[in-house]
Amino acid sequence: SEMCIRDSIWEADRLHEMLGVPVCAYETEAAFAADDKQNGSLLMMYESITCKVHEVFKDGETFRIGEVPVTVLHTPGHTAGGVSYITPDAVFTGDTLMGYSVGRCDLPTGNSAELRESLKKLAALPGNPDICGGHGPVTTLEDEKRRNPYL
């Protein structure tokens, strides 16, 4: 749920081979997966890491994992291509919203104004879904509204 950078794609090809699942990315991020300079692997890991993207998602698109509908919500800020995945009971927010905090915006393509707008989108979601961030505990939307100073 963030851009196709080194820590997000590290094992993607291997998982594709082992499980037969496609590697998917948001429409603006697919190019990062194949470019070790853009995805930061040469800078941070001293090793070229790339992967092939099989499917590209767009904002508002819905797909299924088994019988579960999953809707893509573009939530830029931590990265320009940040997305959250909305299911009936949970929202997978990556580093946009995570355990009473948010992802940093000082890395390439990060933008604090976009992050604020993304947090408004997430706060406006109906109900009280579980929030499954990229780090920290699973929380709920109501908990985040009460305890997260950024929301």
Report residues per predicted region.
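Active-site HxH/HxHxD metal-binding segment of metal-dependent hydrolases
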Residues: 1, 6-62, 150
